[in-house]
Curated annotation (Swiss-Prot):
GO cellular component, one term: mitochondrial membrane
Entry EC number(s): 1.14.-.-
Transit peptide range per the UniProt entry: 1-19
Residues given in the record as heme binding sites: C467
The protein's name: Probable cytochrome P450 12d1 proximal, mitochondrial
Protein's organism: Drosophila melanogaster
Annotated PANTHER family: CYTOCHROME P450
Location(s) in or outside the cell: Mitochondrion membrane
Family under the similarity heading: Belongs to the cytochrome P450 family.
Length: 521
């Protein structure tokens, strides 16, 4: 039975919804009352000529091979902190803003069901190509309005409560132990450097960890079963989708008018991943039924089993979305953490000192209790997110008319909130070009934390629509970094002046043959 329409599915999350409803109504009234004729119109917002902008992405154009960071930075220099990105080929315009007051205004007026457009190719596939699978359940990535609210309410307790992660501490540690052995196998015995394609190994580690949560199984792609065809299909498609989304939904594309080769590849990719996911979850269901028939008491603690209790269709969709949203972004973040620590050996030594107090031996187990005492580890990861921002920011569609930077922006307008760019500006972060995990810790003399605008540090989004996988990513990152730095001293002896580029999300622009030297004690 599909319980999404049941009382249970809509009753979860009542508290936050009520409070956000009253807050959103108040914000809407304030925003509406503040709009006057003195404000400039939407048409007066600076913007490039649509056809010149389109030509800039064509062969020989200014932005032909540019990352999203490069061309938005160029636009910001020309037009200022707010401008319109022209829509074309069936895609509407969107506003880009780098003003913290604008960012706050949009979030304060997003309502109880925030709308995030921008993944049209995935939405089209789910609504028109495979409605037999998705139907009314589009997943958190693609759904909007009340449908999104019901789904989010139903699955929020599964992902957002810390107790839901307890069962994963030990298996995640085991996966990382396997990764450590893999590093020892592939590193050069003389230089101790890993191969140039080490980012593929990192992606396999992240895929293995997320696959454990999404599919209740280890795929074996790190060492044991590297050629598993089903696992490889999921692995490759999860990495391809973001790149294809960037080409279809961010760069100018005619896929809404004609079926382009890139869109056809996207359709094949989404179909392939869906077929494998359905096959794997059917195997899980069959195994679960056998256990029931054998009289075994089933304790549904895993995230997947709890999702299947809601609706098997929800389980399929969420399992895929975990991989699509998580593999590339988390793998790049892990590469960035290792790079930051290798280029700042004093910070690496300080982190290892903290880890030694929690993990006296290399094979010490990590658990819910001892991982509470790792403030410097969390500060390192948080500072890496600031130092190498993952993307430009968050997209929202205005739920009502708002004033942004003095301009009247009508309801229904999509706005790109460029908060991540602000994390590298001295206005908000002193010494922004320095890697300083200490900025996130309490001052040892005053006991106070750094004061920073909450609308400049939003790596996982904000409000009801913030990333539902945040706790999963936090656990994976903390476990992996702790295990690696406890076991190895990490170095990087190459140029790292421009190590990453931002397409849809941040991705490596260079190879990462890190040097891993064993820690003796």
């Amino acid at each position: 039975m599909n319980t999404l329409s049941s009382a249970r599915s809509v009753a979860i999350y009542v508290g936050p919804v009520r409070s956000s409803r009253s807050a959103s109504v108040l914000a809407h009234e304030q925003a509406k009352s503040s709009i006057t004729e003195e404000h400039k119109t939407y048409d007066e917002i600076p913007r490039p000529n649509k056809f010149k902008f389109m030509r800039a992405f064509m062969p020989g154009g200014e932005f032909q091979n540019a990352s999203i960071t490069e061309y938005t930075s160029a636009m910001r220099k020309r037009y200022g902190d707010i401008y319109v990105m022209p829509g074309m080929f069936g895609r509407k315009d969107w506003v880009t803003t780098f003003n913290t007051k604008d960012i706050e205004m949009v979030f304060r007026n997003e309502g109880i069901w925030p709308r995030r457009d921008g993944l049209d190719s995935i939405v089209y596939f789910r609504e028109h190509v495979r409605p037999d699978v998705y139907g009314e359940v589009q997943g958190l990535v693609a759904s909007q309005n009340e449908a999104w609210g019901k789904l989010r309410s139903a699955i929020n307790p599964i992902f957002m409560q810390p107790r839901g992660l307890r069962m994963y501490y030990e298996p995640l540690s085991n996966i990382n132990n396997e990764f450590i052995e893999r590093i020892k196998e592939i590193r050069d015995p003389k230089t101790l450097e890993v191969p140039e394609d080490f980012t593929d190994e990192i992606s396999r580690l992240v895929f293995e960890s997320l696959g454990l949560v999404a599919f209740d199984r280890q795929m074996g792609l790190i060492r044991k079963n590297r050629d598993n065809s089903d696992a490889l299909t999921l692995f490759q498609t999860s990495r391809d989708i973001f790149r294809l989304t960037f080409k279809l939904d961010i760069q100018p594309s005619m896929w809404k008018i004609i079926s382009t080769p890139t869109y056809r590849k996207m359709k094949r990719t989404l179909n392939d991943s869906l077929n494998v996911a359905q096959k794997m979850l059917k195997e899980n269901q069959d195994a679960l039924e056998k256990r029931r028939q054998a009289g075994e008491k089933i304790n549904s603690n895993s995230m997947l089993e709890r999702l299947m209790e809601i609706d098997p269709k929800v389980a399929v969709i969420m399992s895929l979305d975990i991989l699509f949203a998580g593999v590339d972004a988390t793998a790049t973040l892990l590469s960035a953490v290792l790079l930051c620590l290798s280029k700042h050996p004093d910070k690496q030594a300080k982190l290892r000192e903290e880890l030694l107090s929690i993990m006296p031996t290399k094979d010490s187990l990590l658990n819910e209790e001892n991982m509470k005492d790792m403030p410097y580890l969390r500060a390192v990861i948080k500072e890496t997110l600031r130092y190498y921002p993952n993307g430009l920011g968050t997209m929202r569609t205005c739920q009502n008319d708002v004033i942004l930077s003095g301009y009247r922006v009508p309801k229904g307008t999509t706005v790109l909130l460029g908060s991540n760019v602000l994390m590298k500006e001295a206005t908000y972060y002193p010494r922004p070009d320095e890697f300083l995990p200490e900025r996130w810790l309490r001052d040892p003399e005053t006991g106070k934390k750094m004061q920073v605008s909450p609308f400049t540090f939003l790596p996982f989004g904000f409000g009801p629509r913030m990333c539902i996988g945040k706790r999963v990513v936090d656990l994976e990152m903390e476990t992996t970094v702790a295990k690696l730095i406890r076991n190895f001293h990490v170095e990087f002896n190459r140029d790292a002046s421009r190590p990453f580029k931002t397409m849809f999300v941040m991705e490596p622009a260079i190879t990462f043959p890190f040097k891993f030297t064993d820690i003796e004690q």
